[in-house]
């Protein structure tokens, strides 16, 4: 059971706190000036009691007793002059360990919050998401329209396809024939003119398919592996006379 606090205890505590906080000598007159509500007799008795209890140091000077704080063994006081509870090294280390553990928890929490903040910052805003949704919706409608066109478009009949193949084959055949005819004529001219092909080309001014970057129509009548873009052993001359 805790000790009941009496008025005497309060007086002792107030006087002791005043002297310890000021940390300078006091006589009863100075205490009386600080606490006008206390009487001289009460102050003198209280100072004497504190001195006898070893809570204050005192000495008589010229028939006046001076009291001051015990410097060597006095307890540590806070800013208000109250005694600070003393703790052992073990208690302090244990308290420090607890603070360090709490610090680690707070640091982990901070890291987690920073990570969450970065993730939120990297996410699209509602406005950006709506813009992207609108763009994708527009692209989807365009693709659906193209798909519908392909689905409803009339497919080429076999007859039309055959007609197109025949036209391509005929065009290629005529192309090959004319290239061969020109090559034969060119060989005869070269044989009679005694000129080199390069010189004769400069005089006449013809251009080859390669000069004009024209590719031979593939021969679709052959397997894909045998199709060529130009005839073998053919210099692919394409006639273009100078005017």
UniProtKB/Swiss-Prot annotation:
<dbReference type="Pfam" id="PF07106">
    <property type="entry name" value="TBPIP"/>
</dbReference>
<dbReference type="InterPro" id="IPR036388">
    <property type="entry name" value="WH-like_DNA-bd_sf"/>
</dbReference>
<dbReference type="GO" id="GO:0120231">
    <property type="term" value="C:DNA recombinase auxiliary factor complex"/>
</dbReference>
<dbReference type="GO" id="GO:0000794">
    <property type="term" value="C:condensed nuclear chromosome"/>
</dbReference>
<keyword id="KW-0238">DNA-binding</keyword>
<dbReference type="InterPro" id="IPR040661">
    <property type="entry name" value="LZ3wCH"/>
</dbReference>
<keyword id="KW-0469">Meiosis</keyword>
<feature type="compositionally biased region" description="Polar residues">
    <location>
        <begin position="223"/>
        <end position="235"/>
    </location>
</feature>
<feature type="region of interest" description="Disordered">
    <location>
        <begin position="217"/>
        <end position="243"/>
    </location>
</feature>
<keyword id="KW-0175">Coiled coil</keyword>
<keyword id="KW-0233">DNA recombination</keyword>
<dbReference type="GO" id="GO:0010774">
    <property type="term" value="P:meiotic strand invasion involved in reciprocal meiotic recombination"/>
</dbReference>
<comment type="similarity">
    <text>Belongs to the HOP2 family.</text>
</comment>
<protein>
    <recommendedName>
        <fullName>Homologous-pairing protein 2 homolog</fullName>
    </recommendedName>
</protein>
<feature type="coiled-coil region">
    <location>
        <begin position="86"/>
        <end position="153"/>
    </location>
</feature>
<dbReference type="GO" id="GO:0120230">
    <property type="term" value="F:recombinase activator activity"/>
</dbReference>
<dbReference type="InterPro" id="IPR010776">
    <property type="entry name" value="Hop2_WH_dom"/>
</dbReference>
<dbReference type="GO" id="GO:0003690">
    <property type="term" value="F:double-stranded DNA binding"/>
</dbReference>
<dbReference type="GO" id="GO:0000709">
    <property type="term" value="P:meiotic joint molecule formation"/>
</dbReference>
<dbReference type="GO" id="GO:0007129">
    <property type="term" value="P:homologous chromosome pairing at meiosis"/>
</dbReference>
<keyword id="KW-0539">Nucleus</keyword>
<comment type="function">
    <text>Required for proper homologous pairing and efficient cross-over and intragenic recombination during meiosis.</text>
</comment>
<dbReference type="Pfam" id="PF18517">
    <property type="entry name" value="LZ3wCH"/>
</dbReference>
């Amino acid at each position: 059971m805790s000790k009941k606090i009496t008025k005497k205890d309060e007086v002792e505590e107030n006087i002791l706190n005043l002297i310890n906080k000021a940390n300078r000598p006091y006589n009863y007159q100075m205490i009386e000036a600080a606490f006008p509500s206390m009487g001289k007799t009460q102050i003198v008795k209280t100072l004497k009691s504190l001195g006898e209890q070893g809570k204050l140091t005192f000495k008589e000077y010229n028939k006046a007793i001076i009291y001051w704080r015990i410097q060597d063994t006095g307890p540590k006081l806070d800013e208000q002059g109250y005694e600070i509870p003393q703790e052992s090294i073990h208690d302090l280390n244990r308290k420090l360990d607890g603070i360090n553990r709490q610090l680690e928890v707070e640091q982990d929490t901070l890291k987690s919050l920073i990570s969450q903040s970065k993730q939120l910052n990297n996410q699209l805003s509602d406005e950006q998401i709506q813009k992207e949704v609108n763009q994708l919706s527009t692209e989807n409608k365009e693709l659906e329209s193209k798909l519908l066109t392909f689905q409803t478009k009339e497919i080429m009949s076999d007859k039309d396809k055959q007609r197109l193949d025949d036209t391509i084959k005929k065009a290629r055949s005529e192309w090959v024939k004319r290239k061969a005819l020109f090559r034969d004529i060119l060989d005869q001219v070269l044989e009679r003119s005694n000129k080199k092909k390069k010189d004769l080309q400069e005089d006449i001014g013809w251009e080859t398919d390669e000069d004009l970057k024209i590719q031979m129509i593939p021969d679709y009548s052959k397997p894909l592996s045998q199709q060529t873009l130009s005839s073998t052993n053919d210099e692919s001359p394409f006639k273009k006379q100078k005017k």
